[in-house]
Amino acid sequence: MSETVLPNHLIHFSETSLLKLPPSLYKTCKTYLNQEDIKKIQKAYSFAFYAHAGQKRKDGSDYITHPVAVTEILLELKMDPDSVCSALMHDVLEDCNVQKNNLAKIFGDDVAHIVDGVSKLGKIETKNIADNNANNLQKMALAMANDVRVVLVKLCDRLHNMRTIEYVPRKKQIQKARETLELYGPLALRVGMQDIRAELEDLSFRCIHPMRAKMLEN
């Protein structure tokens, strides 16, 4: 097998010298995964940590806090190790100049497929939902995903982004909330994720109609 050539910013990543998982991730992982699985997840965390080095979230926190939070949500669903690895690395193709074949060589074809699917699914967000039938968009998303694990990782990604949407400019908040109502809420229903669907819809409503949401609370 030929040597895997990674971008320069991943020079510190080593499969033989891995970073420790954040305590919250490790604690949940060990409740249902074996040590071999956890080591693979540790490798994915190390890869994501170095891939996102220097990147920041809108709130000023290190970007790696986002994939970690997404993974914490996914772990609540007791997902398989490849899904967990994919959640940790779900943004590396889009944001870090990493190639799909890099992931396939290091983590296997399944992980590469899921991460690539999440990246492609995210591109639907750039379409103008007003110009498309929402049901058709949902069907397109499911067809593009071709694997329910892709949809689940993307739903967890969107859920964390909606939980932290206050740091995004107001115009983009509205856009993301409408996308969530039109696409991700119904997608969650289609794959049986009722709790995620309910929270996505609640967060979207609060974003679009903050005053009405406050009135309903009182």
What are these regions (language model features)?
Residues 1-218:
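Active-site helical microenvironments for divalent-metal-assisted chemistry
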